[in-house]
Structures are given as structure tokens and as C-alpha cells.
Curated annotation (Swiss-Prot):
GO terms for molecular function: ATP binding; formate-tetrahydrofolate ligase activity. Its EC number is 6.3.4.3. This is Formate--tetrahydrofolate ligase. It catalyses: (6S)-5,6,7,8-tetrahydrofolate + formate + ATP = (6R)-10-formyltetrahydrofolate + ADP + phosphate. Pathway: One-carbon metabolism; tetrahydrofolate interconversion. It holds the Pfam family FTHFS. InterPro entries: Formate_THF_ligase, Formate_THF_ligase_CS, P-loop_NTPase. Belongs to the formate--tetrahydrofolate ligase family.
Length: 553
């Protein structure tokens, strides 16, 4: 059966019963129908919980993805089945990838979060609220320039873009304000996808409604004719934008097929944003659970690094254990096998591709945290391939455990769950890759590129070099950095698979996200508005006269 067929046959528990498992009363949730709810921001921590945090990340994936969310959900179910009270905390999907290449982002097989259709499509309206808030701010900025423009905002240096929750390459570069004096001031701008917006990052890093408003007020929208930054707070727009987002700030509660409480909230991409669900979602899960399992987008070089160097600084807690998801398919792909041949045994390609997994292991070990590798099982895997991965990981003093969450749900993930509990109780000495206060922006970027990606050197474009100087002048050197790069490679070139060395990492531009609290570095040709593939997932979706959807996988 397909994912959506499995989800359609599931018997869901009322969301009030799921809330009860977390000690939440009906007064502490706001129901969105029978099976979805938002959690009140003032929920108090339960004192008798262990508050253990498990981070699930992965190796560099194939274009189809490697089932990280599936393993995450299976692990959460397995822990509960073994009587370790657990909550899952994960990101909510963007409709761009849902209708583009992924077709859905709520796990797969018998490890899914439900109601699957609702979560993948409009859910509780968080992304719509973010889109509206973002574009309201854009409209306010354009109106300000058209009217008196008391702060002398330079229309050529407005960096705030509009957003849409779609993959629409035609909107990457646009001209607004055409049509004469009453239509505004003409200027070049563009659209980003909502998941890459600063407001998405702010929503995911805010710790309260007050913090949300403070962060929004710090957003830099552009520069004056004297090249001085102008913030939302200086324009006095922060309260209006906060009002639009006040409900979206509340975490969303749903369930897995096995009725594990799951908090799904916030959805920044890991390649063009920081790739982690909201701090409030993770903190709420930690407050109410013995174990919280959460994920970071794409590979450990992207979401993993950003969780540990960006989100952790706000959350104030590091993971007690890290799970790196690997597949035979992705390792063979990183070892040079063609996409069309990934269902065939290829031990030579697998051996070469192990360099990718080994680098991710060593990278996560730099943070001083215990690690286990989860081999996400595919039906095409052979015993020889599985054993090769286990043997190679053993040489790194890391255990690799076969999981079958897609076919068996939590029951296929018990061995991994037991290992995670063991690791979470082991001692660790967490450290960051860079010192956020001591290292300047350039040093931070170079440390990530060299220590995590394996680069020999970092090349900054002339534009990026000038921005480094200006950002230092503005006092932004003490912020974390968020590198936007391809998810398929350690380099900025998606064709360089495996574990390249002796390469130059290219940074072309810096983007200040002062409200979010970091500076984005755009590497290679990375774009913040994706496009659709040749055959979008949308063309294979159907809905009948009764509203039944097929093709959403």
C-alpha cells in the first residue's frame, strides 16, 4: 500500500486523548477539529520527567530522500512501546516541496504522522500566517517609501522580499511599483519561499510572544542612502506583524499511526535556512516527556550543524544522543553509482560511499556527543551490504543498527531505541565548532567550511568581502552563521559527491537575519526560491468527488 492508503486506514485517537498522555488538560489546548490542536504557550514543565533529547540527522541524501523522518517517527513509537515515555518534535511541511519533488513530509509506511493529508497541505494555517505577515511587512515598507520616507530608505537597498509557499522560479526576480506615481516607487526585488524567510526562522527561534515581537523589531529591512541599516522597530511595524503571528507561535499537536504524541511546528529548510523545528515545540516536548526525539533537515553538515550551532544556543540544551540515518542507496550514490542502478548490489560503490558516512560521524563527534548509525532498510538491500556498513562503522567505534520503520513501524526500530536510551544516559562533553563571541563572521564561516565540509580554503566574492567589513561595523560579528548550500554535497557543487577534500568553498553573498539572530552566507548558486522539477509530484495527485485524495505520498 502507498503511504496515503496506510494513513487512510488508520484509526486515530481524539486529540484530547493524545494531550492527556502529555498531562495536558482540554483548557491547555485549542482544538482544530478532532485530531489537531495547538498547545498553550503557558504550559508548565512536569517535574518528574527525565527531559532527554535525541537528535536525528543523516548523511547526504539522494534526490528522493533517505527516510530520516520515517526513522524519527519509528524511533518515537519504539521508545513508547518499550515504556520510555516519548514525544516526537518535528517540522511542518512546506507545500512547495509537497507539490514539487517530495510529495509529502510526514514519514512513510507504518511510521507516519497523521492526519497526513491535513499536515502536508494547510494544517493549522501557520505557513499562511507567515506568508501574510511577511507580505504585510513588504507592503508597509513600500508604502513608507512612497509616502514621506522620513528615514531616507534607499529603494535600491531594500533587502526584505515577499514570499509564497510554492516553488515558483518565475518570481525569483521581479520589478514592483510599476504603473505610475500612485502605484508606488519602482524597484527590483524578488520572492523567496516562505520556509526560507526570516519570519519563519524567527518563529522557530522565539521563546515567547514577547521574544517574538523583540526579534521582529530587530529585522533589518534595508539601508538608507548613507548605507545605514533600518529595522522594523525603527519603522514601528513590529506590533502589527506580531499580531498576525500570535496564534502561529503556538505549537501544533498531532499523533503517529501508533498514537505517539507529536508536536509539528515550524518548517525552515536546512539547505537555505536553519532547518530545525521551533524551540517552543522542542521545549514543550522536553517539559512534558522523559524522551524527546527531534530532527534536523538534510544531512548532518546542514541541519545537524545548524541545530548544534544555532538552535542549541537558544534552546539551552544539547542533545543527549545523535542518530545518523544512512541507507545503502545513498551510500552507493555517494560512491558513484547511478540513480537508476541503486536497487542493484554494488559493494564497490558502497565501499567508496562509506567515506561520506564516516565524515558525518567524525563531524558529530567534534561536538562531543554519543552517536549511533541507523541503517534505514530498503527491500533491495542485501546482507553483504548491511554487514559492510556495520563493519565499517565499528572501525569508527560507532554501532550501526538496522531499522525497518517503514514496513514495521516502531516494532522495526526497537534495537535502535534501546541503544538510544543507553547512549542518552552516557556522559558527554558538548562543545561548539566556533566561539560565537570571540570568532568573527569570517572565522566562523571558515571553521564550518574546513572542519565540517572538509574544504581546504574559503573564497569570498568581492561583494561578500565588502559585506564582512560593513557587518563588522554594524556590530554583527558576534552572531552565529547559517550557510545556505546544496544538500547533496559537502561542497557548494551538488555534483561532487562522497567526501571531497582539497576543494575551495565559495561564498558569494551574506544576508543579515538580525531578527532571527544569525547571518546567512549564500554558497555556490544556492537560491532561496526553488523551482519545480520536470515532472512535479502535483501531476500525479488526484481528488475524487467525495474529497478522497490519492498520489500524496
Amino acid at each position: 500500500m502507498t503511504d496515503i492508503e496506510i494513513a487512510d486506514q488508520a484509526t486515530l485517537e481524539p486529540i484530547t486523548e493524545i494531550a492527556e498522555k502529555l498531562g495536558l488538560s482540554e483548557d491547555e489546548i485549542e482544538q482544530y477539529g478532532k485530531y489537531k490542536a495547538k498547545i498553550d504557550l503557558n504550559v508548565k514543565p512536569l517535574p518528574d520527567k527525565k527531559h532527554k533529547l535525541i537528535l536525528v540527522t543523516s548523511i547526504n541524501p539522494t534526490p528522493a530522500g533517505e527516510g530520516k523522518s520515517t526513522v524519527l517517527i519509528g524511533l518515537g513509537d519504539a521508545l513508547n512501546q518499550l515504556n520510555y515515555q516519548t514525544t516526537i518534535a518535528m517540522r511542518e511541511p512546506s507545500m512547495g516541496p509537497v507539490f514539487g519533488i517530495k510529495g509529502g513530509a510526514t514519514g512513510g509506511g507504518y511510521s507516519q504522522v497523521v492526519p497526513m493529508e491535513d499536515i502536508n497541505l494547510n494544517f493549522t494555517g501557520d505557513l499562511h500566517a507567515l506568508t501574510s505577515a511577511n507580505n504585510t511587512l513588504a507592503a508597509l515598507i513600500d508604502n513608507y517609501i512612497m509616502r514621506d520616507n522620513a528615514m531616507n530608505l534607499d529603494p535600491r537597498r531594500i533587502i526584505w522580499k515577499r514570499v509564497e509557499d510554492v516553488n515558483d522560479r518565475a518570481l525569483r526576480n521581479v520589478v514592483t511599483g510599476l504603473g505610475g506615481p500612485m502605484a508606488g516607487v519602482p524597484r527590483e526585488t524578488g520572492f523567496d519561499i516562505t520556509a526560507a524567510s526570516e519570519l519563519m526562522a524567527i518563529l522557530c527561534l522565539s521563546t515567547s510572544l514577547h521574544d517574538l515581537k523583540e526579534r521582529i523589531s530587530r529585522i533589518v529591512v534595508g539601508y538608507t542612502y548613507d548605507k545605514e541599516p533600518v529595522t522594523v522597530g525603527q519603522l514601528n511595524f513590529q506590533d502589527a506583524i506580531t499580531i498576525i503571528l500570535k496564534d502561529a507561535l503556538k505549537p501544533n499537536l498531532v499523533q503517529t499511526l501508533d498514537h505517539t504524541p507529536t508536536i509539528v511546528h515550524g518548517g525552515p529548510f536546512a539547505n537555505i535556512a536553519h532547518g530545525c523545528n521551533s524551540v517552543l515545540a522542542t521545549q514543550t516536548a522536553l517539559n512534558l516527556s522523559d524522551y524527546t526525539v527531534t530532527e534536523a533537515g538534510f544531512g548532518a553538515d546542514l541541519g545537524g550543524e545548524k541545530f548544534l550551532d544555532i538552535k542549541q544556543r537558544v534552546l539551552g540544551k544539547h542533545p543527549d544522543a545523535i542518530v545518523i540515518v544512512a541507507t545503502v542507496r545513498a551510500l552507493e550514490y555517494n560512491g558513484g553509482a547511478k540513480l537508476a542502478d541503486l536497487n542493484e548490489e554494488n559493494l564497490d560503490a558502497l565501499k567508496k560511499g562509506m567515506a561520506n558516512l564516516n565524515r558525518h560521524i567524525k563531524n558529530m563527534q567534534l561536538y562531543g556527543l554519543p552517536i549511533v548509525v541507523a541503517i534505514n532498510h530498503f527491500v533491495s538491500d542485501t546482507d553483504k551490504e548491511i554487514q559492510m556498513i556495520k563493519d565499517d562503522c565499528a572501525k569508527q567505534n560507532v554501532e550501526a543498527i538496522l531499522t525497518d520503520a517503514w514496513a514495521k513501524g516502531g516494532k522495526g526500530t526497537h534495537d535502535l531505541a534501546n541503544k538510544v536510551v543507553e547512549l542518552a544516559d552516557s556522559p558527554s562533553e558538548f562543545t561548539h565548532i566556533y566561539d560565537v563571541q570571540v570568532d568573527d563572521l569570517q572565522t566562523k564561516l571558515e571553521k564550518i567550511a574546513k572542519q565540517i565540509y572538509g574544504a581546504k580554503e574559503v573564497s569570498f566574492s568581492r561583494k561578500a568581502q565588502n559585506q564582512l567589513k560593513r557587518f563588522a561595523k554594524y556590530g554583527w560579528n558576534d552572531l552565529p552563521v547559517c550557510i545556505a548550500k546544496t544538500q547533496y554535497s559537502f561542497t557548494d557543487d551538488q555534483k561532487q559527491l562522497g567526501a571531497p577534500t582539497d576543494f575551495t568553498f565559495h561564498i558569494r553573498e551574506l544576508v543579515p537575519k538580525i531578527g532571527a539572530g544569525f547571518v546567512v552566507a549564500l554558497a555556490g548558486n544556492m537560491m532561496t526560491m526553488p523551482g519545480l522539477p520536470k515532472e512535479p509530484a502535483a501531476v500525479n495527485m488526484m481528488i475524487d468527488d467525495n474529497g478522497k485524495i490519492t498520489g500524496l505520498f
